[in-house]
Design a protein with these regions (language model features):
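Feature 14080 marks short, conserved micro-sites in well-ordered regions
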Residues: 1-255
Length: 255
């Protein structure tokens, strides 16, 4: 469920349209299907579903991911009307080997400092950090934190996750291929200003790969950002940051 412009939006299946986007004003009469993005039935007679997901309000509109059957799972926008609910950007244009549209899988949608950030895979850079100003032209890759391809020719992924706004900047976890899994990154909204904040778990594991601190559960409290992490010394414990490398430290070794 998400509130946007005084109405409640959610995904539901009414038995006639599949799992689609619904809207409610809080009354029985005002609770209804907003739009069926993927109409029709499959070969078994079941309704197709667009599966709206990852909903967030941004600039008084609703943004979400869905699959309309033509573009794959991509980024959509709605102004609260059926006519105004449409594809915002098809980030992964090519089809797979079976002729079906590839999905970019937009995820982790969050507003920060007047922009919409999310993760997606455009088929070129792997799963990376994207940004949008709410327009098709202004929806683009922000930073490829792990460039290059693997031995099979597939793009490396940095897998940005745990996106959160703090003090006007975006904080998130990622693996840049150098510092390990789920270290803490920060972005000021520019490519140059998107970078590692701190590598909490230094060194390599027995396979020669960088240790990861596996940061999770980022939440702002009393003007600081708290999270869980494993620095390789204390185990998985509570950490805090004031947004600087020097101000990122262990709060308590509880066990």
């Amino acid at each position: 469920f998400i509130e946007c412009n005084g109405k409640l939006y959610f995904r539901a299946n009414d038995g006639e349209t599949g799992r689609e986007l619904f809207v409610s004003d809080g009354t029985a009469e005002g609770t209804q299907l907003l739009v069926d993005l993927l109409p029709g039935k499959d070969n078994y007679g079941d309704n197709y579903s667009s599966f709206p997901d990852n909903m967030v309000e941004f600039n008084e509109k609703l943004y979400f991911s869905a699959n309309n059957g033509e573009t794959g799972r991509e980024l959509f926008v709605s102004d609260g009307t059926a006519e105004g609910t449409q594809l915002l950007a098809d980030l992964r244009l090519e089809d797979d080997n079976y002729g079906y549209s590839h999905d970019s899988y937009p995820d982790n949608l969050v507003e920060c400092n007047g922009k919409l950030y999310f993760t997606a895979d455009d088929g070129v850079h792997g799963n990376e950090l994207f940004v949008s100003d709410g327009t098709t032209e202004g929806t683009q890759l922000l930073a490829d934190l792990r460039p290059g391809d693997d031995n099979y020719g597939y793009s490396y992924d940095s897998y940005p996750d745990n996106l959160v706004e703090y003090n006007g900047k975006l904080y998130f976890t990622a693996d840049d291929g150098v510092h390990g899994n789920d270290e803490l990154f920060v972005s000021d909204g520019t490519t140059e200003g998107t970078q590692l904040l701190v590598d909490l778990c230094l060194g390599d594991n027995i396979y020669g790969d960088s240790n990861g601190s596996f940061i999770r559960n980022l939440v702002e409290f009393n003007g600081k950002l708290y999270f869980t992490a494993d620095d390789g010394v204390h185990g998985n414990e509570l950490f805090v940051t004031d947004g600087t490398t020097e101000g990122t430290q262990l709060v308590a070794d509880i066990r």
